[in-house]
Amino acid sequence: MPTTIIHSDDAFTTQELVFRANDTNRFPAVRTPLSSIFEVENISDRAASIDVEAATLPGLTDGTWGEVLPMSQVNRERKNFALIPPKVGKLFNVKLDEIQSVRQTATVTRESLQSVQDRKMGQVFLSLEDFHERARLQGILGRVINYAGATLYDLRQAAFFDTEPNPVLGLELDAANPAPGALRLKLAALTRSIEDRLQIGQNTPTGYDVQANSDLFDLLRWHPETMEAFKRWEDLARPEGSPLVPFRFAGFDFHDYRRTGLASGRAVVIPRGVPGMYKTIFGPGDFMSVLNQPGFARYVSVEDARHDKGFEYEVSTNPIHMCNRPEAIFELDAGAGDNDTNP
């Protein structure tokens, strides 16, 4: 059967390819250090409308039993802004020699063509996931980026959340004679500062992840205070324990972040458990057959290559990764810190 006839099959329409690409049984989601903390939202509009107060609890009013509660007095208009998701993707070709090699009894079946297609799609999906992870880290730090790493939106600016740059707390891990308990005191003050910024009682974190550049991770792992804590923790005190495994100290879970995006000697503190604090928004695809539908994580379309020399595929995604409470995100520095932050 000629490949052009197979390719006109309903299985190769844009809509069916999109459903196939987002089938998690066929293409399982890749777990990354930051993927689990982001809530996913799918929108059908070209722009995402962001409510600045979406991650805060509403105020209450006093009333009289037996009467309707009075309307709350609003002193200012609710602030919203719009973000347009960037399109990121890749073109790839399924060439004649790739199809020729999977022929079965001189014919090309739908399944054999799909096997070549799925293999190449899977490779592109891994590249997309690498971009998503970079964009998640920058989203936590208050920036929406494109694939090249350029900042499309700095959400800390006045037009958006109107917050100051991320405070940088210096841990002074390289101090020659650190005072006993000094590191714990710094981290305790950091905890209070984050909780104050999140309005403790309304948004209380359930924990803190620290994704650290390897330099900071190693300095902290072998810091005198940390080593003293390990002596009381039998499993990590054993010689065969890996020095690269995550560890908990002073209420923070420290991880050796092996991905790109963190400068040497730097770390980012990520509060966990605050509903709606981290969001991934997938915008709609730019194909007629999926117009006005909620956005998918992956889009795929195909057309015949020029002069009948194979098939050309486009794989794309339209994501925004963002943090709704950028004022509560702190960075750590192994030295004194950039701005001498003292929570």
What residues fall within each predicted segment?
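Long, contiguous amphipathic alpha-helices that act as assembly "spine/axial" helices in icosahedral shell
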Residues: P85-E164, R192-S214, D218, K309-S316
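Short, Φ-rich (hydrophobic/aromatic) sequence segments
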Residues: A21-T24, K186-I194, I281, G285-V290, ...
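Ordered core of a single globular domain
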Residues: R184-R238, P243-P246
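Hydrophobic alpha-helical segments and helix pairs
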Residues: I5-P28, T151-R184
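Assembly/oligomerization interface modules of large self-assembling protein complexes
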Residues: L34-Q104
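N-terminal alpha-helical "arm" segments
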Residues: M1-R46, N324-P343
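Sequence/fold signature of self-assembling virion shell proteins
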Residues: P224-P343
